[in-house]
Amino acid sequence: MSKETFQRNKPHINIGTIGHVDHGKTTLTAAITRALSGDGLADFRDYSSIDNTPEEKARGITINASHVEYETPNRHYAHVDCPGHADYVKNMITGAAQMDGAILVVSATDGAMPQTKEHILLARQVGVPYIVVFLNKIDMISEEDAELVDLVEMELSELLEEKGYKGCPIIRGSALKALEGDAAYIEKVRELMQAVDDNIPTPEREIDKPFLMPIEDVFSISGRGTVVTGRIERGIVKVSDKVQLVGLRDTKETIVTGVEMFRKELPEGRAGENVGLLLRGIGKNDVERGMVVCLPNSVKPHTQFKCAVYVLQKEEXGRHKPFFTGYRPQFFFRTTDVTGVVTLPEGVEMVMPGDNVEFEVQLISPVALEEGMRFAIREGGRTIGAGTISKIIA
């Protein structure tokens, strides 16, 4: 079945496999394509084709990730699988593959391991809203050890609940056996995908959210007024809509008197489109790149937040030395850099290149911020880290 024949008449969901190294994430990804290919809903992808991951860049950071697509009878899925732990951290923090939900793969023989816990915490920090658990390698458990699996399940449920993931379904199976064609275990993979269908809700589409456009450029057109250009991040804007300009200065309200695309007048602009908006009563000096134009009161300007951050290693062209509380890099949000001061949490003396850390930031100017938003950290124009806002403070 070629890529082109995938019909887009089903809701689209982004998911990924997360979990400890060697617990079977990639094997499960391959097993899902095997199970669904039997129903003509996927192209079978073997382990090596998924494991051999291409490099991609997100927010100036190189990430290895494999993208697989498949369908269930109800939905179309894009599934991301990463080879190494550092790639998961980078992938989740940069939002390279924004996940609507995740499949947490845990080996029944090992139970929850350090990276299991780290991935659950990371999922919470970056705003992955739902998790479904696949308890893998169940074929390795002898009958006398069967009770241990119940304990592993209990421990997992507690661990997930601690981080705010309540009542996650847990499906037992064997990815390897399913991949080898064992019918009973293929059925378990189908059961897993049914649980994913049922427990990971379809996200609200970008077009249905409140209007927001980051401003990339500002022009003044003589006799007509000021035009701001950018790519609409979400929602719809129509001529004569009331909007606000938020960030960098005091919030201003104005009215959209024109929407243009490729020099043509349009009645409206929609999520994903590059447009110019003509704004009533706004001078060229009242507005600048880095502000957003949005539905009134849908976004507020903020200066202080907590964030989950990945700091690039030297080999990834990051810093060569650690940084400390008081460090003042630039934080790049949407279309602009703003200087901010870092405060490390108690007990953390310094941050080394390659670390994955949570800290607070105080910006010198207000920016339109929201929890779950991604940003890059830059020094002199080069990226040295990436982050996600986990909590707005002020």
Swiss-Prot record:
Provenance organism: Chlamydia muridarum (strain MoPn / Nigg)
Keywords tagged on the record: Cytoplasm, Elongation factor, GTP-binding, Hydrolase, Magnesium, Metal-binding, Nucleotide-binding, Protein biosynthesis
Top-level taxon in the UniProt lineage: Bacteria
EC number, as in UniProt: 3.6.5.3
Cellular component per GO, a single term: cytosol
Record: residues binding GTP: 19-26, 81-85, 136-139
Gene: tuf
Catalytic activity field: GTP + H2O = GDP + phosphate + H(+)
Region G5, residue ranges: 174-176
First-level EC class: hydrolase
Region: G4, residue numbers: 136-139
Annotated family: Belongs to the TRAFAC class translation factor GTPase superfamily. Classic translation factor GTPase family. EF-Tu/EF-1A subfamily.
Domain tr-type G: 10-204
Protein name, UniProt field: Elongation factor Tu
Any one GO molecular-function label of the UniProt entry: GTP binding
CDD domains noted in UniProt: EF_Tu, EFTU_II, EFTU_III
Region described as G3: 81-84
